[in-house]
Amino acid sequence: MKKSLVIFCFTLFSLNCFAQNDLPNVNLQSIDGKSVALKDVTNKEGVTIISLWATWCVPCLKELDAINDVYEDWQEETNVELIAISIDDSRTLRRVKSMVNGKDWDYTILLDTNTDLKRALNASSVPLTILVKDNKIVYEHSGYSPGAELELYKKIKELSK
């Protein structure tokens, strides 16, 4: 009985890890306030990194800074694109534009002001990093620790073949 339960749990976990879900087609806002459909800005030629973050989330900022240090190389090698989507609410939304300008990130920055994407992804915490290929979610990771960007890059290279 115990062995059957372990096998069942492993199978369930494996299916969950490898299941490909469609990227939700939600409307977000650009930093300039324009409405943007998420599916219209994902990379049609390869892999897109979608990073859900917030100005108050220290691990989010560390992750985006770490990726920024190597992003140009990643783009040259794999044609990957990154879309950083802020989940800041009305109380902290004002900080997004000035923070992005101060960080000098070379990413597409969008705002999930109504938390439509966060809800559609069932995201309970940030940072949440998702890899998308052909409008399918092919990888998800939540949280950040130094060096996690290297594991992310390995996944990007695998998907870019």
What is each of the regions a protein language model found here?
Residues 62-102, 114-117:
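Structural microenvironment flanking redox-active thiols in thiol-disulfide oxidoreductases
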Residues 19-21, 34:
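Boundary of Sec targeting at the N-terminus
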Residues 45-48, 53-56, 125:
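Short pre-active-site segment immediately N-terminal to redox-active cysteine/selenocysteine motifs
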Residues 131-161:
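Thiol-/selenol-based redox modules, centered on thioredoxin-like
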Residues 49-50, 82, 129:
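Hydrophobic beta-strand anchors of alpha/beta hydrolase catalytic cores
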Residues 27-47:
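A short beta-strand-turn-helix
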Residues 99-132:
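Short, internal strand/loop/helix patches
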Residues 4-15:
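Sec-dependent N-terminal signal peptides
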